[in-house]
Amino acid sequence: MPIKKAIYVLGIIIALIAPFNSFAQKDSKANEAETTTSRISKIVQLTPVSLRPDISVEKFMDVEPNAVRLLIHPVSGDFYYTTFNGGVFHVIKKDGALVSEKIISLEDHGINKLQGAVFAGSKLFLCGNTIENSNRGTRGRLVQFSITPKNKPLMTVVFNTEAYGLNATTWDHGWNALEVSPDGRYIFVNSGSRTGHGEIQDDKGVYPNARDNALTTKIFRIPVDAQNLDLPNDINKLKSAEYIYAEGIRNAYDMAFDPSNNLFAVVNSSDYDHSEDMFWVRQGRHYGFPWIMGGIENPQQYPEFMPDPKKDPFLNATSHGMLMKYFRNDPDFPKIPEGLKFSPGVQNLGPDANEYRGHSGKILDGDNTGVSISTFTAHSSPLGLVFDNKMVLSEEFKGDGFVLRNTVGTKSSLMKPFTDQGRDLLHLDMSYDKASDNYFVKTTRIVDSFNNPTDAVMLGNSLYIIEYDAKVGSIWKITLPSKLPKLRQSGKKGG
């Protein structure tokens, strides 16, 4: 029996990591302020290249290893960044040079795997996962620190979750992205999947039959002034407390509000050749995981599924999921609950990041076929979503979105069949379609050749982009046009 597969397109063209896969080690100097002078890296790295003459790229500074999130303090205007192993750094000037001063360490907050950070006024919120059960289990954890001049940051616990099982894969995404509601009343928190595509991940039998649970694959909404909450691994209790905002999202590693206060999230999909979604996230909606990703049905939900890359071109024989036999016949895979409706992803109209695998198995370009996809080229890992909320850019970019792609086709066996491109900055020109009650996006590459970009912030008409590196990372300043007239685009998919 053939595997069911459908591309959920909303229209024909007429007119968005796995996170890092090891828990961090403790810092050796937890309570001691550390400063590191910005320096030019001795490591051979790419220099980002603008793809337009009216966009400039310059090095802002080097940063500590394993940088993940970049922040701007809303009150002071100072830059801060966080690292995967628990550090929070304040960027200051010392003797004319930019300096990274460590102000918070793992010992201060107890988050072994620090992935999320956001400011709400002078309150810095941090989220991630703790280690439990001799590194076989975990809890989600959200804390906040008051960051004010000359005062030691003091921590308040917002929530801890009930403990649940880790797994032995790179797919345990954890609690990782934060966003503050425009009215300042809530913190939105993403908890990614603990599986690749909904399969059993029991950590070699420690957690029998464990798949995803009530605390994963969701975006939560928590009152900004909440303290010492205990979130249970119980879907009914979480819904009764109104903590769950949206469900069925594999891993929304970044979220952002647009100028109209719509919440969007960018998501990375599984090792199957699903496109990478960008969702317009609305309260009470379900976005398909684990049954649909990138507009493509997950074949493992069907009892007759027998994974064979020779028969199913959406399966890559060299993928982690195939090599580890996580794609498997799975007759006990959960069924779609009766009456459950899925909300589709934002539809990409191109001209960039819109390559996809068609029903025939061939790689196609939406520009040539007239098909919109949900939303970005497969395996590209969209991160660092931002919008021009202050409407300071030129007419061409005013109020628009921007997103990074962390993966590059030349270095990814999964992405390379689709494109050699990636690790770039995309301009997102979004428009609402009333008929489908969804958004369409025109996507254009504007800066190329980042090293390992993970996050971005906007200040004035400049984007600041931070890169993750095991030895030395970087922050780049991308200056966008603010008062120039709209320019004609020439060509496509260059760089």
Where on the chain are the PLM-derived regions?
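Beta-propeller domain segments
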Residues: 29-50, 193-243, 250-251, 255-442, ...
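Bacterial N-terminal signal peptides that target proteins for export
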Residues: 1-9
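Bacterial N-terminal signal peptides
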Residues: 10-18
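Short, glycine/acidic-rich beta->alpha junctions
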Residues: 62, 71, 109, 169-172, ...
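C-terminal target-recognition/interaction regions appended to catalytic cores
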Residues: 400, 444, 452-458, 462-465
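Bacterial Sec-dependent signal peptides at the C-terminal "C-region" and cleavage site
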Residues: 17-28
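Extracellular/periplasmic ectodomains of large secreted or surface enzymes and adhesion receptors
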Residues: 477-495
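Acidic, Gly/Ser/Thr-rich repeat motifs that build Ca2+-stabilized beta-propeller blades
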Residues: 26-197, 378-435, 462-480
